[in-house]
Regions:
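Acidic, PIN/NYN-like endoribonuclease modules and their adjacent C-terminal/linker elements
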Residues: 1, 103-130
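Short active-site oxyanion
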Residues: 34-37, 74, 110-113
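Alpha-helix capping/helix-boundary segments
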Residues: 8, 43, 82, 101-102, ...
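Acidic catalytic patch
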Residues: 16, 41, 64-92
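Short, well-structured N-terminal submotif of metal-dependent ribonuclease cores
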Residues: 1-39, 54-61, 67
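Structured helix-beta-strand junction loops
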Residues: 33-34, 72, 93, 124
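Short beta-strand scaffold positions
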Residues: 4, 38-39, 77, 97, ...
Length: 130
C-alpha cells in the first residue's frame, strides 16, 4: 500500500501540471486492489477544501470526486464507513464536507454529540450548538 498526499491526488484529478500530472497519473495507473493507494482523512478534508476554496468547484463536482475515490477498488480510504456517511450528509445538506466528516468521525468514535460554535454546522451537519 502506498500513501497518497493531497497534491498527488489533485494533480491526478485536475491534470493541470505538465510536470507533476503525468507522474501522478502513472502512479494511479500502477495501483491495484493488491497494491492500493491509501488516502487519509486529512487528505480527503484538504481535497474538499481546495476544490471548494481554491478552484471554486460546485458541491456536486466535489461529491463526484469524493464518491469516485470512495468507490475505487484501487484505493483504501481511512475510516471508509464514516467517510461514506459524511458524503451522504454532504449530498443532502448545505454543510461543508469537513463539518460532515468531523461529526461522523466523532459519532464513529462513540460520541453522543459533537459540540460546535458554528451555526451552519449545527443546522446542516448534525452538530449541537454550544
Amino acid at each position: 500500500m502506498i500513501g497518497l498526499d493531497t497534491n498527488v491526488v489533485l494533480r491526478f484529478v485536475l491534470q493541470d501540471d505538465i510536470g507533476q500530472s503525468p507522474r501522478s497519473t502513472a502512479l494511479f495507473d500502477s495501483l491495484s486492489p493488491q497494491s492500493p493507494g491509501y488516502i487519509s482523512i486529512v487528505t480527503l478534508a484538504e481535497l474538499a477544501w481546495v476544490f471548494d476554496r481554491t478552484y471554486r468547484k460546485p458541491r456536486n463536482e466535489i461529491a463526484v470526486l469524493l464518491r469516485g475515490l470512495l468507490e475505487s477498488n484501487d484505493l483504501v480510504l481511512e475510516n471508509h464507513d464514516a467517510v461514506a456517511q459524511a458524503l451522504r450528509r454532504f449530498d443532502s445538506s448545505n454543510a461543508d464536507f469537513s463539518d460532515c466528516l468531523i461529526e461522523r468521525l466523532c459519532a464513529s468514535g462513540g460520541c453522543s454529540r459533537t459540540m460546535t460554535f458554528d451555526v451552519g454546522a449545527a443546522k446542516s451537519a448534525g452538530m449541537v450548538l454550544l
